[in-house]
Structure formats: C-alpha cells, structure tokens
Amino acid sequence: MEGKEGPPCEVRLPTPGAEREGPVHPELGAFGESASDAIKLSETSNDAKKEEIEEELDPRIQEELERLNQASEEINLLELQLDEARTAYRRILTESARRLNGLATQLGACIDKARPYYEARRLAKEAQQDTHSAALRYERAVSMHAAAREMVFVAEQGVTADKNRLDPTWQEMLNHATCKVNEAEEERLRSEFEHQRVTRLCHEAEAKVQTLQKSLKRLIIKSRPYFELKAQLNTILEEHKSRVTLLENSVAQAKLRYSGTLHNLEKISEEIHARRTQSSVLSQRAPPLGAEAPPSVKDGETGPPADTVSLLSLQTIASDLQKSDSVEHLRDLTDVTSLDGRETGAVESGGSRERGEDRGTGGAFRHHRSVSL
C-alpha cells in the first residue's frame, strides 16, 4: 500500500542554519572563496611580516646565543683542563708519598731525630719573611707621618700669612692635616711595635736553629736527602695546587657568564612575548572589515582602487546568501529590493507564480534572487 501523500501546497522547508541543498551561483561562490582566500593570505603575510620585523629589530638574540655558545665551549675546555690538573696533582701526591716512604725506610730513625732542626729552620724562615713585611710597613708609616707633618707646616704658614684676617680655607686645611698627622703617628707606632716583635721572634728562631744544628749535626747530615727531597716535592705540589685553584676560579667565572647570558635571553624572550601579546590585543580591538565608512575623496585625489571595493561588496553578498538559507525568511519579505535600490515588483510576481506552480506539482522549491552590481 502506497504511503499517503501530504497536501499539495505543503512544502518541507529546510531548517534555518542548515546546509543549502540547491547550488550557489557559481560566480558568487567563486567571489566568496576568493575573498576568504585573500583575507587568509593577508593575515598570514601580516603575521610573517611581524615575525620578520621582530627578528630584524631584535638582533640581541643572536648575540646572546653566540655568547652562550662561547661560554659553553669555554666551560667544557676549562673543566677538561681542571680534571687533568686534579689527576696530575693526585698522581704527584701519590708518587711523592711513595718515594718519601721508601727513603724513610732506608734511613731509619735519624729522620725523626733530625726533624726538630728542620722544623726550627722552617719557623725561622717564616719569621724572616714576617720581619721583612713589618719593616716595609714601618717605613711606609714613617713616610706618611713625614708627609702629614709637612702638610701641617704648609697649612700653618697659610693661616699665619694674614694676621688681620683668618682664612677659613686654610683653617680647614690645617685641621685636616693635623688629623692626618695623628693617624700617621698611630700607624707608625703600631708598625714599629710589630717590627720589634717579629724581629725578636726571628732572632729567637735563628738562635734555636744554631743550637739544634750543633747538637744534631750527625743526624742532620744523615737525614738530609729525605728532607731535601721532601722540600722539592712540596714545591711541585704547591705549583699544581695553585694551578688547580686557578682553574676552579676560571670555571666558576665562566659558569657565571653562562648563567648571565641565559638570564639575558630569558629577559629578551619575555619582552618579545609581551610585545606579541600587546599586538594581538590591539589587533582584536581593531574594527571589523567594512565597519568604518570610507574617507571622502577630495578634489584632485583618487579614491581606493575599484578592485578593493568590488572585493568587499562581493564578500558581503556571499555572506548574505550563505546566511539566508531559510525560505521563511523570504516569505516574510513584502518587497524585494535590488542591491542598487530599485524596486523589483515584476520579479516578485513572477516568483509568486513559480511558487504556485511548484506547490501544485509538489516539486522542489526554487529560489531566484535578482542581483544587480
């Protein structure tokens, strides 16, 4: 049994917003697609231009990256040298201990018996160095004291030059020179006392060395190879230790430079991100396409190109056609007005007859719209 057909005038209309079943006018569809493609291409080109401008206007990134690479290479090189220096120091230390232990086994107990003499010699040598340093400080304090006294003499001459008037400049200079004399006098007395003290200690250390040398003469001669070798090895170890310390300081400085370069790159990245965020906010606040009226053209000036105006008009038409898919929207219209403002009553009457024929036959609904550019 065949299905019951509906009334002849009943037409099943598409829901608003659904896809249109009928084909869109080929020229309008092409114009809409070309307009959309043009807008996408313009946005892509604008983004690319913005990125190129940012790269061109901010060359600091390349400079900081070069510094970062240099610092990284320097750190790697210095760490390799530091590892080699530490390995050499440990090797020399182990070899020194082995040689000294072997020599101590050969010489026997004379090393321990002669050790006070060599310890006294070491203390006497340190006392001599302290005495020399104290003497230099005392001489410098004496020179400063003499210069301060000379300044006081000059200031007194300036103050007493004019007996009828007291010059405040010379008075201030005299006060300043007097303070310098007092400070220099205190430093001279302090350095003199220190020099006397270390000189006395040096004399005592030298006297002790002489006493031990007389009492331990045979043991000193017998154990001399051991202590001479020990002094040589200590000198070599001190040199390697100084090199290790120097390399450690160099590595620390290189790492500080590397960290500073990373910090600079982070700051540059934050600045670029802030600029991009601000640019995106400004672009979102920009008026939409066609919202602003075109500026009036003055005499002697040319307006915008005809291609640009046509493109904007066609884009608006295509958007309207895509939105007006519902026939109910067309039924509510009492008049159909062309794009140039002229009334199209004949088109409306023709369209009514076509709709009546379509309803009588139950065929598909067709929609014709007059477009005048």
Swiss-Prot record:
Renumbered to this chain, region (Disordered) spans 1-36, 274-308, 332-373
Residue ranges annotated as coiled coil are 35-98, 170-258
The UniProt record lists the keyword Zinc-finger: no
Biological process terms in GO annotation: intracellular signal transduction
Cross-referenced Pfam families, in alphabetical order? SH3BP5 (PF05276)
Molecular-function annotations in GO: guanyl-nucleotide exchange factor activity; protein kinase inhibitor activity
Record carries keyword Coiled coil: yes
Q: Which GO terms describe its cellular component?
A: cytoplasm
- Please give the superkingdom of this protein's source: Eukaryota
Stated role: Functions as a guanine nucleotide exchange factor (GEF) for rab11a.
Name the family: Belongs to the SH3BP5 family.
The identity of this protein, by name, is SH3 domain-binding protein 5-like
Which source organism does the UniProt entry give? Xenopus laevis
